[in-house]
Amino acid sequence: KLLNYDLFLAKDFLKLQVSDTKKVFEKKLLNSFKEKSLFDTKLNCFIHLFDEQIFHVDDNTIIEGILQSEEYLRPSIDIINKYIKLKDKKNSFLNRENTCILNIRGGEYKRHRELILPKSYWLNAMANMKRFKKKIDFKIVTDDFAYASTLFPSIEIIKGGIKEDFMNLFFCKYAILSNSSFGYFPIKLGTPPDIVIAPNHWARFGNKYERWASPSNIYKDWLWQDKNGEIRKPAEIEKSKFDLKRIYASYNVYTTEDFFKKKTLKDFLPKKFRNLLKRLLSKLFPLYVGYLKK
């Protein structure tokens, strides 16, 4: 059962195997389970780890969390194709043989500058892709047309909404991804691309501590590019996972995420005014202010 399924933006083109979405549940009558997380004070963010307790929750329990570890997908990752399918698999999109899709994330990410990938990441990734595939064209899908076109005015941005972005990634043979879960699902649900390049350390790309945020986002068969444009060896990625388990084993203080939330000026502004202001500023300063594309 998915709560608030009507708010799921991809419901028009994805078919999810879910129970009755019209049935109303009284939250106060349900149990609650939250995926275990910890706060990394050096990276200044929450780290979500695989939480084995999820396999032991009772019925009638609301499950909350990031839930991005592939260890939840048992017996294997292939199980997602049982529960999530395209409503129409007709490939009416670009010829993928010599095309690489760049999934550039802007929008709300610009509120959190540590999430925005530097231009050098994309330039290095395109250079790396050309080493693997000499004859290749690049196209962009993005949630922020103004931001992406400012970064790369000479690269074509594929127009459309969330469906077009998803489908172009679903059918692609080559992809360069941002640190966003949006790119994960079409890549994993579609025919596996020949090459996928993604940012090392994910949500804290190039951090000086050489830590992943979060280790749940380390996915098999992808190439992980560091801040210097180097593709990290699989053995180095595995060592990172091992080191993180050792580091986080020493964390032992539990609290709620609300404890870390701080109010800012925007919290005191009416939502309607915030949206209007954000839209205006995103047009004036596309590299610094984001407005989420609907």
What are these regions (language model features)?
Residues L123, M129-P215:
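Donor-binding and catalytic core of enzymes assembling or modifying cell-surface/extracellular glycoconjugates
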Residues K1-L2, T61, N98-C100, K135-F138, ...:
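Hydrophobic beta-strand segments of well-ordered beta-sheets in folded domains
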Residues K188-F260, F268:
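Catalytic binding pocket for nucleotide-activated donors in carbohydrate/polymer assembly enzymes
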Residues L2-K133, K233-L292:
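Secretory-pathway luminal glycosyltransferase catalytic domains
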